[in-house]
Amino acid sequence: MDFLASVVVAIVAYGAVYFIGKPVVALQAKRIEVLDVAERYSAVDAGAPEDTRDAAVKALFEAGTSLRAYERGWSTAVRLWCWVWGYDLDLAAQALYGLAEGPRAKMVIPPEARRNTLNALYVALGAAKHLPPETVDAIKRMIVETKAARAKVSA
């Protein structure tokens, strides 16, 4: 009987690790990677050397695309994890795409707008502990206003 109980526990543990733990750990690793890419390339603008701009655009778009893939194809465990911790993967992907506009040199993006976009990424990924509460509140208000405007346009 003890052997059977051990087998059942082992199967349940394997299922928990494989179907819950593994996707959540992968998401957390991707989250850290995305934050690293955003920190590294958020200040790159049209005045940077071409190879730096190309690397920034590529890295930011790849990070945004991978987050969007997580957002669209996530498991129930990842969905629950994002809900509990307040992650907004779609908003984070949009912020990364916004940061990529600076190095593309299609338009001049002021440093304040880039900083707000980076801060929105921090808020979307639950990494805003280093920001003052006033900044977090202001960014959250901007996010709500942007989502409301987008909903109004699409309606």
Question: Model-flagged regions — what are they?
Answer:
Residues 1-21:
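Membrane-embedded hydrophobic alpha-helical segments
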Residues 17-155:
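Conserved non-transmembrane functional hotspots
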